[in-house]
Amino acid sequence: MSATPVTQLTPSSQPQQPCSPLLGASVTELTSWVQQQGQPAYRGKQLHDWIYHKGVRSLTDISVFSKQWRAAVADVPIGRSTIHHRSVASDGTVKYLLQLSDGEIVEAVGIPTDKRLTVCVSTQVGCPMACDFCATGKGGYKRNLERHEIVDQVLTVQEDFQQRVSHVVFMGMGEPLLNTENVLAGLRSLNQDVGIGQRSLTLSTVGIRDRISELAEHHLQVTLAVSLHAPNQALREQLIPSARSYHIEDLLAECREYVAITGRRISFEYILLAGVNDLPEHALELSKHLRGFQNHVNLIPYNSIDEVDYKRPSGDRIQAFLTVLQQQHIAVSVRYSRGLEADAACGQLRTKASR
């Protein structure tokens, strides 16, 4: 699909300041900035091409600019990270620990499948949600990622694979809807600057009150994935502490509103935990919540981690859960995580370097 413009996510009318990282800026912003520096407007498009398509990491390396001007802006950061560590799984999945300018480490994952290359990106350093089954939340929360730090993850994976990224999922470290401004800016840049179609971008959230409704107002064509993980409020509170302040019925009401406004189907993520939320009666209860609006359920068999005692259900238990949903006419599939040897699968995005 072509890169449909995110018309509701327009670039800032204010030009980039000279000392701000340039990655994430639109061609309009870059043009304004180069003109501030006394350069002709066409240099903005050239700069845009070098940043997003030629992988330049320093303005001093842009050969089409004069040596004098390159020297004058040598200290202006583009905003690229460095690869701190790289792990490769037998299925070709690659996990990256990326070091940011302040020394913090975030994780990104490159997932090759056939002719596609999907990147799983982080939106925060750590995560404040502290979901009971998730490795990332066990490490605490540091800060939000800036827009350039989000876009950089995609460019880094693309350059390392030497293959064009086709899809991006915001399912790494952090809760995207607690960093809405930078996430929306990152979505805009990935769509309009990097050239990835909106429908190839997936935004995942555990559910933050009112944020899904606010997202709907942008009328985006991105895919929204909601981490549900339980069929009722009591069990969801056990697994997701933040659910105590956001009832499952309120969350689902926002989801229905989102579908009505955008016309886009919602994906519901459901991690299967042995003996916890994987019984046939859980599947039946879940199905009752999902009738009457467009949705799809991704069942994710759990990936065990050292810090918690949850286990993956047996194949028979997974199939039984799947069958109940299918019998209730719920669109459903099982998603088996990639990159287990690299600790890169869903729920295992954790920085070993911080241990």
From Swiss-Prot:
It catalyses: adenosine(2503) in 23S rRNA + 2 reduced [2Fe-2S]-[ferredoxin] + 2 S-adenosyl-L-methionine = 2-methyladenosine(2503) in 23S rRNA + 5'-deoxyadenosine + L-methionine + 2 oxidized [2Fe-2S]-[ferredoxin] + S-adenosyl-L-homocysteine; adenosine(37) in tRNA + 2 reduced [2Fe-2S]-[ferredoxin] + 2 S-adenosyl-L-methionine = 2-methyladenosine(37) in tRNA + 5'-deoxyadenosine + L-methionine + 2 oxidized [2Fe-2S]-[ferredoxin] + S-adenosyl-L-homocysteine. Specifically methylates position 2 of adenine 2503 in 23S rRNA and position 2 of adenine 37 in tRNAs. This is Probable dual-specificity RNA methyltransferase RlmN. Binds 1 [4Fe-4S] cluster. The cluster is coordinated with 3 cysteines and an exchangeable S-adenosyl-L-methionine. Coiled coil: none annotated. GO terms for molecular function: 4 iron, 4 sulfur cluster binding; metal ion binding; rRNA (adenine(2503)-C2-)-methyltransferase activity; rRNA binding; tRNA (adenine(37)-C2)-methyltransferase activity; tRNA binding. Residues 113-341 form the Radical SAM core domain. Keywords: 4Fe-4S, Cytoplasm, Disulfide bond, Iron, Iron-sulfur, Metal-binding, Methyltransferase, rRNA processing, S-adenosyl-L-methionine, Transferase, tRNA processing. Its cofactor is [4Fe-4S] cluster. InterPro entries: Aldolase_TIM, Methyltransferase_A, RlmN_N, RNA_MTrfase_RlmN, rRNA_lsu_MTrfase_RlmN/Cfr, rSAM. Belongs to the radical SAM superfamily. RlmN family. Disulfide bonds join 120-346. Residues 1-20 are annotated as: Disordered. Reaction proceeds by a ping-pong mechanism involving intermediate methylation of a conserved cysteine residue.
